[in-house]
Amino acid sequence: MTAGSKVFSNDSVRSSSFKSIKIVIVGAGNVGSTTAFTLLLSGLAAEIVIIDLNKKKAEGEAMDLNHAAPLSHETRVYLGDYKDCKDATAVVITAGKNQKPGETRMDLLKANISIFKEILREVTKYTKDAILLVATNPVDVLTYATLKLTGFPAERVIGSGTIIDTARFQYLIGKLYGLDPQSVNADIIGEHGDSELAVWSHASIAGLSLADFCEESETKYDEQALNECFKETKNAAYDIIQRKGSTEYGVAAGLVRILAAIIRDENALLTVSGLDSYSNIGDVCFSMPRKLNKDGAHRIINAKLSKDEDAKLVESVKSIKHAIESIGLN
């Protein structure tokens, strides 16, 4: 994930294409509503449409958000239905069963694949051109399901993947060294879940490996402390859910960061989930650094991993593939 990349900017100048930017959010739960709020504050979209089976809740969210618009950006937010997917720049899918304390993301699969089939059936009635951005867990499996069930081009079906894990990882390493997290380049790849892995071999600060940075800055290189950063990253969602019941702020910021890269045609490298293959395992969706622009997500680099990282990525991809096969979508 590129260091120094931000969703928000003080630059209030908008392109002439701003009025055509419509983002549809399916799901008015914690993640969906927080994504709508974050998107409103970003000023990226002229229209934000909220769709939910609970229309009263979705309408209430839209009303509340519209009251924030005069204090932020000129954006129209409204309760919509699937017809509003027509001419949408992107459809963000956050709807689904939430992860409860003690549950893994994979535990949600059976319930959420059923929900997704209904949602995608409706979405594809009204758009064949939007970018589909999946946030519902297990996100890698549901990104693959979205691709298969819609027949959309692979570059236009994107999962939020490990963008939030990468952000968490950078935050924790930055905290360890007393640095702005955006000064840290360190990626989490593979599954957004228990088998994800840290790419230690390419982690860097100011162009230096972590070990070299510590030597140059006369800071102790503590491998155990760094491993704790990864452990905390991997367990972050469980820890937050145990305390407050759900995660939403970081995920929403990640989704809007992805949308920003698409809307601004940035060609930004972000760790998101997309169709890929690895080590002859076959087609599967998992996170790697991908280039994001107005056309979607594109894999432009091959990972040069250490032997240990390669083995871990193989196992991570296999675990996603197994889950895909369990719902008959291979």
UniProtKB/Swiss-Prot annotation:
Catalytic machinery residues: H192 (proton acceptor)
Protein name: Probable L-lactate dehydrogenase
Top EC class for this record: oxidoreductase
Superkingdom of this protein's organism: Eukaryota
PANTHER family: L-2-HYDROXYCARBOXYLATE DEHYDROGENASE (NAD(P)(+)) (PTHR43128), L-LACTATE DEHYDROGENASE (PTHR43128:SF16)
Alphabetical list of InterPro entries matching this protein: L-lactate/malate_DH, L-lactate_DH, L-lactate_DH_AS, Lactate/malate_DH_C, Lactate/malate_DH_N, Lactate_DH/Glyco_Ohase_4_C, NAD(P)-bd_dom_sf
CDD domains according to UniProt: LDH_2
Pathway in which this enzyme or protein is active: Fermentation; pyruvate fermentation to lactate; (S)-lactate from pyruvate: step 1/1
Record keyword Oxidoreductase present: yes
Localization per record: Cytoplasm
UniProt feature coiled coil, ranges: none
Molecular functions (GO terms): L-lactate dehydrogenase activity
Annotated substrate binding sites: R105, N137, R168
Principal localisation: cytoplasm
GO cellular component terms attached to this protein's record: cytosol; nucleus
Protein family (similarity comment): Belongs to the LDH/MDH superfamily. LDH family.
Catalytic activity: (S)-lactate + NAD(+) = pyruvate + NADH + H(+)
